[in-house]
A protein has these predicted regions:
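Short beta-strand/loop motif that positions the catalytic acidic residue
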Residues: 301-302, 308-310, 314
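Hydrolase active-site cap/lid region
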Residues: 234-289
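Catalytic histidine-centered segment of alpha/beta-hydrolase-like enzymes
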Residues: 341-352
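Short alpha-helix in the alpha/beta-hydrolase fold that links the catalytic acid
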Residues: 318-327
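Alpha/beta-hydrolase active-site loop
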Residues: 195-215
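Short, surface-exposed "cap/lid" segments of acyl-processing enzymes
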Residues: 135, 141-182
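Gly/Ala-rich beta-loop-alpha elbow adjacent to hydrolase catalytic centers
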Residues: 224-228, 232
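N-terminal targeting or regulatory segments adjacent to alpha/beta-hydrolase or S9 domains
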Residues: 1-119
Length: 379
């Protein structure tokens, strides 16, 4: 009998050991710095002067505006004009070089590749934002207004994520600061060389706000995609500059890391409890406070007008978090719930509707009335 007990104890210890190792590896994949997270590579099936045919897969089957890139060139593709079980044919809106069958390309949900001048013909300055870790590279597109817009890209996404909405913001006269943050390419590394999932990165958003205020901004609109949305919401809870935030725009914001990680664990056929193991390992490795990064239910003192986009087909960040978030403050949050749209692709699905929503919201919230929300002031 005693032998059986010892065997059971040994089996439990072995199970705990392997579970801990698995959680440590999972946390490492989540926190490890990499310039490329997920790249979809395609070989073109065919092309004409007006259309391009691609292999049919989940990414290429979504209707809307998308991009492809190869070497130093790119093309912007329009809506689907034909499809079958094997291929999808799209209209070519723009291409920097002729396309041909067999060309190896990467799929680009951000549509544009390059800086604002090269891709959109918008003049900009390369600036460096002082931060606690060193200078952060940023693009500054000038404008005549005293309200600046600060764009915060998502997890493993490039600054180009914000280029889709940049022409709209520039047309409205806003100075736009496209920020990079710690561990981005060209930006300083965090001391432990790990991502902190917004728990420390929000301070780089604060550095961007401080820079804007020091260079003529009277107030700021924060605009975040995915983890950038988590960083914006963390800023609103922790920063001493919240009184200077005029409004917020969130696109597929990551408001609850537990649910986002659990979604990916489910896809990989791991049990629900393994999500907690990964979080435990991530907290141990990087000191992340996951409870403090849960923004699904806004703090009572949160009084910032917000425009929220989220797609019902989001496979990365569950839309339920945005549903709960919007329901908590219906008087402050204007919710654009996009049917059948994947992660951070609301603009791609319907650019005109997306841009109209942004224009309407910013026109309403950035008139010449003073900022009246928020109880904190800058120090």
């Amino acid at each position: 009998m005693l032998t059986i007990v010892y065997v059971l104890i040994l089996l439990v210890l072995i199970l705990m050991l392997f579970t801990g190792i698995g959680g440590w590896i999972g946390a490492g994949r989540l926190l490890r710095i990499t310039d490329v997270w997920y790249v979809v590579t395609l070989r073109l099936s065919g092309a004409t002067e007006e259309t391009v045919t691609l292999p049919r897969q989940v990414e290429t089957a979504y209707d809307g505006i998308f991009g492809i890139a190869w070497q130093h060139d790119y093309a912007i593709l329009g809506k689907i004009v034909a499809s079958d079980t094997q291929t999808v044919t799209r209209r070519i809106i723009k291409t920097t070089q002729p396309l041909s069958a067999g060309l190896l390309v990467t799929w680009n949900i951000f549509v544009y590749q390059g800086d604002p001048q090269r891709t959109l013909g918008l003049a900009y300055d390369d600036v460096r934002i002082p931060s606690e870790l060193g200078p952060l590279p940023a693009w500054l597109v000038p404008g005549e207004r005293t309200t600046w817009v600060l764009l915060v890209h998502g997890f493993h996404a490039p600054r180009e994520e914000g280029l889709r909405i940049l022409p709209t913001l520039a047309q409205m006269g806003f100075p736009v600061l496209q920020l990079s943050y710690r561990n981005d390419a060209g930006a300083p590394r965090s001391p432990d060389h790990l991502y902190h999932l917004g728990d420390t990165e929000w301070r780089d958003v604060e550095s961007g706000v401080r820079y804007a205020l020091a260079h003529g901004a009277q107030d700021v609109v924060l605009y975040g995609w995915s983890m950038g949305g988590c960083m914006v919401e963390t800023f609103l809870r922790r920063s001493s500059y919240t009184a200077q935030i005029r409004a917020v725009i969130l696109d597929a914001p990551l408001l609850d890391w537990h649910k986002a990680i659990d979604t990916q664990m489910h896809k990989l056929h791991f049990p629900h409890w393994f999500t907690y193991v990964v979080e435990w390992a991530a907290a141990l490795r990087a000191g992340i406070n996951f409870a403090a990064l849960n923004h699904e239910r806004p703090a009572r003192e949160r009084t910032t007008p917000t425009l929220l986009f989220h797609g019902t087909a989001d496979g990365m960040v569950p839309i339920g978090s945005s549903d709960t978030f919007a329901q908590a403050q219906p008087d402050l949050i204007t919710y654009q719930r996009m049917n059948g749209v994947d992660h951070a692709q609301a603009w791609n699905a319907d650019p005109q509707a997306y841009e109209d929503a942004v224009k309407t919201f910013l026109t309403r919230e950035t008139s010449d009335k003073p900022v009246s929300h928020g109880e904190k002031s800058s120090t």
